[in-house]
Amino acid sequence: MKKLFAFIACALVCGAMSAQLKVSIMGDSYSTFTGSMPKYYDTFYPNQFCGVTEQSQQWWAQVIEKNGWQLEKNDSWSGSTVCCRGYNHDDYSDRAFVTRLNCIGNPDILFIFGGTNDDWTHEPFGDYKYSDWTKEDLYFYRPAFAYLLDNLKKLYPKMKIYSLLNDGMSENLGESMREICKHYDVPVIAVEGIEKRMNHPTAAGMTKIAEQIQAFLDSEKK
């Protein structure tokens, strides 16, 4: 009888583990943490000045812990843009989100936290375009973001995608992200009132981001 109970308990635990949702992150510096991403990616965290010194303080780590999920891949590269154009009009094809769409593993959920650097480069946003992209199109945020979501939807048809909108961004970025996400039925979670140093979230800022994401996730369950 004891062996039977042990077998049932093991089966329940294994079943729970197999049902655990896998989460991937596609982001820029806000989502980096050394040791959680590919070694050759540029990173910003841990950062003593911002007070974020442990991976558990990262916004995504808090959300994953809160929901009992597991991290699949953190594909975040500090300073990266969604499109292939970066600061000083440099070519960012090697680190652009559109280049990294095959690097997220096989998650059930994907959080995309990008657009901040695209906004800060002050490059043109381009036109809304939802098909027949050219290589040149991918150097502009609007067509590049549409290309990203379109391909993610096709490559991972069962995956749930959330797009995070940083606070303090231009109206142009906010409108562009919302319009493109609406086209692909991707929820936008706009975070607000985030404490920052050097334009990056502090430990308190990370917690604020996590809390606002959690509030959005909880609202979906109602």
Question: What kind of region is each of these model predictions?
Answer:
Residues 30, 78-81, 168, 195:
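Residue-level detector of flexible, active-site-proximal loop/helix-junction positions
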Residues 22-24, 39-126:
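Conserved SGNH/GDSL esterase-like catalytic core that processes O-acyl groups on lipids
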Residues 33-35:
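Short N-terminal binding/cap micro-motifs at the start of the first secondary-structure element
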Residues 30-31, 205:
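Short active-site segment of divalent metal-dependent hydrolases/proteases
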Residues 26-27, 164:
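Short hydrophobic segments within beta-strands
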Residues 93-222:
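Alpha-helical cap/lid subdomain in secreted, periplasmic
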